[in-house]
Amino acid sequence: MKNVSPSYLKHHFLIAMPHMADPNFAHTLTYIVEHTANGAMGLVVNRPQELNLADILEQLRPDIDPPALCQHVPIFIGGPVQTDRGFVLHPAGKTFQATVELEGDLALSTSQDVLFAIADGVGPAKSVITLGYAGWEAGQLEAELADNAWLTCPYDADILFNTSSELRLEAAARHLGINLSLLTSQAGHA
């Protein structure tokens, strides 16, 4: 008997299908940070919230006025879990107090010093800052994939860092040769 290992989606994007009913994930593009037999963790990368980096810095270091450029650095809703916890996806190279190197020259930092470095102009030139994350229990993401809730797409740094947030979902679908507006959840009958 052939031993088949499961296929995990670490370092991929999840594209929410147009019929996604969960309001936390409708019309989202999610980067999968980790996916194992024990579950998965991802960050929604196309849902900016009202906050910007200046707002966060005012809370973290109230004695220093944030640079004006920080007002133009969006903070994304990374998912519904631990929405007060920050995550910063950025190109690998610079490391901070809590930086994990991911695949494909990508890194994830979770310490405040990365935010200060970005604000002070010495941090990563490109980044996606989120509050919260998306989490799936063992088998949950696999079940959602089997129910056609998601499409999967290989990670592409250009989509994450060089595409405006409102165009990332469509860009990932285009990467697969798909137009999301033409998809349906209904099966056809021949």
Swiss-Prot record:
NCBIfam families: PRK00228.1-1 (NF001266). Belongs to the UPF0301 (AlgH) family. It comes from Pseudomonas fluorescens (strain Pf0-1). InterPro entries: AlgH-like. One of its GO terms (cellular component) is cytosol. This is UPF0301 protein Pfl01_5311.
